[in-house]
Amino acid sequence: MRYPKIGIRPVIDGRWGGVRESLENQTCEMAKIAAKLISENLKYPDGTPVQCVIGCTTIGGGAEAARVAEQFQMENVVATLSVTACWCYGTETFDMDPNTIKAVWGFNGTERPGAVYLAAVMAAHAQRGLPAFSIYGHDVQDAKDTTIPADVLEKILRFARGAVAVGWMTNKAYVNIGAVAMGIAGSFCDPDVLQKYFGIRAEWVDEVEILRRIAIGIYDPEEYEKALQWVKANCREGFDKNLGKDLPEVITKSKIIPAEKDWEFIVKMTLIIRDILFGNSRLDELGWHEEALGHNAVAGGFQGQRQWTDLSLIHISEPTRPEPIS
């Protein structure tokens, strides 16, 4: 998988002749400890540590900023954290990529004005219409202090969490299973909001698709048996509140799944919805190539289409398995 990464930009005073040279080690160390902090404390949804990419050079001017930007584009960097302990050339060094999420950490030190650069570059970001988060410590640190104060640590991690979340969901989908339920406006999925605000697409799958996959067996039978055994061993049923009631025929006829088959249906439905959202390579092996792809979802919703169980599939819990078209 190509993970969304956070790029660390070590920004430095571009004046050679003793100034820049004296700041290289400190600036690079800030970049390293920021990357270490993020990777050791944050994970992607699959449990993998968040990956950081440190710029291939310290950034003292526009030429080096462009080199690092090109590097980051190749690495799928979705957000940048610029770090510095000194004054730097503001608009010559800032991240001007409109597609990255940005933050700047200015070191609050005893010797050089990290705060001055931070204030200047934040003004530049605002002027150019490129929003950035400002990170600055409350307490003054010694120039050689390589620890990250608690307030700075929290700000960096908050920024990184949000940035990774945006990167993870970008160009994925919110999958609506069903449609608007009984005219309830709150269950309507607004595709414009998802696209323009969250950067994800909206997709719809009719709930009949769940019944279709159950009826003809479009799921992994081995995974189903394993899941069903787990459910029987670990899930306890509550009492039946309708037991003994004289229910109207319209209700009893709607119960097309026998009570003793409820768990089988639920397990199949759960696996199928998972496959719809995220895909399943096992289905490809079984010959169900389109279904194996899934919908590249980051999330999904069961919209509660009321009529979906009106389709009475008599043998729904005992699927036949026709040979798929190869």
Role assignments for model-derived ranges:
Residues 1-128, 136-176, 180-298:
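Metallocofactor- and cofactor-centric catalytic cores in central/energy metabolism, strongly enriched
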Residues 84, 304, 320:
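Glycine-rich, N-terminal phosphate-binding loop of Rossmann-like dinucleotide-binding domains
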Residues 90, 310, 325:
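Glycine/Thr-rich phosphate-binding loops of Rossmann-like dinucleotide-binding domains
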Residues 294-309, 314-317:
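Structured mid-domain segments that build the active-site/substrate or prosthetic-cofactor binding neighborhood
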